[in-house]
Amino acid sequence: MKLTQEIKFSLQKTQKVLSIQMQVHHINDFTKLFKKCIFPGSRWQLEQENIKSIATTFEEPLPENLQEFIKENNCQILEKEVTVGYDNMTYNEVLQQLLPKNVQAPQGYEIIGKIAHFNLSLEQLPYKYLIGQVLLDKNKHLQTVCNKLEKLHNVYRTPQLELLAGNNSYDAIVPEGGVRLFLNFEKVYWCTRLYSERERVIKYIKELSNGKNIKVLDLFCGIGPFSLRIAKDLNAQCLANDLNPECYYYLLKNIIENKVQNQVTPLNMDAREVVLKIYNKEIDFDFNHVYMNLPVLAINFLDVFKGFTQRTGKVDLPYIHVYGFAKGKDDQELIEQFSQRIIKGLPGFDKSQILRFHILKNVTKMKKMCCLSFQLDKKSAESEFGLVEQEDGNNSDFEDDEKMEQHELVEDVVNKKVKID
C-alpha cells in the first residue's frame, strides 16, 4: 500500500475553530506565549483580517492568561471554518487513520544521520511504503527511510535493506561523543544505540588505568567509534581492526577526519591473525586493554590469549572486555554460564576474577546480551600456547532461539583458520 494523493485527500475535513483577530504587531508575542494553543498548520492573514486560529473547543473556557491577552490588546474572538488534513496531522495521527485497527504504527526506528530504518513486523509489512512515506513527510531532516529485510546472515554483519521512501542513498555522518563518523549503512555494521555502552566502557577503562598510558586492542572495531572516542577522550593509543574491507575504508576516513592518525592504527584482517602478528613481533603494539564487541563470536577468540606471557615475555596482564550471550533467570546463572564458555578458551579463568558484569539488553526472558570485564589470569597467561577447537556457532545453544533485533545479531559466522608459526 502506497501513500497516494487520493489517500491524502481522504483525510481532509472541515471543522469550526475559535480564532482571534488582532493587530499585526501582536502576532509574534501571541505566537510565543500561546504556541500550544495554536491550531496545527494554521496561518494568519496579515493583509486581510490578521486572524490566528486556536485549537480550543467551544465548550472549553479559554485559559486565563489568554483571556487577559485578548482584553489587554483589544482582540476579537471569531468563529472560523478551517480545512485540515494530511499536512496538519502528525505521523501517529495519520497512521492511526490509515492502518487497520489490528496493526500498530511502528514506533521503534533508528535514526542514522539522515536515514531512518525500521524492523517492521509481519503485520506491518503490507503497509511498509505507506509507513515509510509518512515518516519521511513528517520528519523534514530525513532523506531516506528503509526496512531491514532479515537477520544478519553474513560474517560482516551488514544488513539487507529495502528502500521505503526517499533517496536510495545510505551514506551518513553520525556525531557521537565528540567525533564525526562517516559510514554507509548498507555496507557496514552500525548501531546508534550502542552509544551509551561505549561511554560506559570508556569510563571504566579510565577508572582501571587511572586515565594514563591506555593502549587498546580493538579487535572488532567496525568503522572505529570506540577507538576514536577513547583516543579523543583519554588520549589512548589504539590498534583498531575489522575484517570487513568496507569498515576498513570508513575507519581510515574517520581517523583522518577526526585527526587521530597519531593515536589510532587501522588494520583489516582476522582478529586472531592480529594477535598472532603481535606475538611474532610483526606488529609492534603493547596493549593493556582488549575490547571484543562481537557478541555472537567474541568468546571464541579468547583462546588466542592463552600463553600470553609465554609468547610475549610480559608479566603485566591485559584487561579484557568481551561481549556475548548467556541464559539464566538471574545474574548468578548468567555469570556462571558466561564463565563456563570463557573457560573453554582460558582454562585458568575463574568467575571470582570478574571485575564487572553488565547486561546490555534482554533478548528473550532468559537470554541476555552481556559484557564481562576481567584481567587475563596468570595461569592461562603462563600456560602453553595453543588454539582451542571452537564450537560451531550455528549449532550452539546460544543460536537456537535468536530473536534479537537484527542490528545486534550475526548467525552465520566464519571462524577463519590462521596458521601458527
Swiss-Prot record:
SUPFAM superfamilies in the record: S-adenosyl-L-methionine-dependent methyltransferases (SSF53335)
The enzyme's E.C. designation: 2.1.1.228
Binding-site positions, S-adenosyl-L-methionine: 198, 242-243, 270-271, 293
Protein family per UniProt: Belongs to the class I-like SAM-binding methyltransferase superfamily. TRM5/TYW2 family.
InterPro entries per record: MeTrfase_TRM5/TYW2 (IPR030382), SAM-dependent_MTases_sf (IPR029063), TRM5-TYW2-like_MTfase (IPR056743), TRM5/TYW2-like_N (IPR056744), tRNA_Gua_MeTrfase_euk (IPR025792)
UniProt cross-references to PANTHER family, sorted A to Z: TRNA (GUANINE(37)-N1)-METHYLTRANSFERASE 2, TRNA METHYLTRANSFERASE
PROSITE patterns: SAM_MT_TRM5_TYW2 (PS51684)
Protein name, per record: tRNA (guanine(37)-N(1))-methyltransferase
Any single Gene Ontology cellular-component annotation: mitochondrial matrix
GO MF term set: tRNA (guanine(37)-N1)-methyltransferase activity; tRNA methyltransferase activity
Keyword Signal: no
One Gene Ontology term from the biological process aspect of the record: tRNA N1-guanine methylation
Superkingdom field: Eukaryota
